[in-house]
Amino acid sequence: MKIRSICFLAAVVQLLPLATSYANAAGESGVASVYSTESGGRTASGAQLNPGALTAAHRSFPFGSRVRVTNRRNGRSVVVTVNDRGPFVRGRIIDVTPAAAQALGFSGLTQVTVERE
């Protein structure tokens, strides 16, 4: 019984990244928000927070990932580079810089689709 449990756990550990990457490739929908630039500090990747850059915070995409964010309300989209972690507010799936929000045509919050490029 113990060996079966170990084999099952090993299989799950090996297959979980595949399931996650498939889900990420298929895209996710939810709420996007605009970064607060008041702190003016560094991102989780160590980069300086630049409000004029097309960057974003995502909970699970690796740093350096390029993702297409599409505003579901107006159809506008932009490709951003993930260089931070977040958002840490329930129901939100991505934080974008003010420059990315401007390109997407929103301020505050909006419904988006996020897909890896």
Language-model segments: residues:
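Secreted/periplasmic proteins
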Residues: 2-117
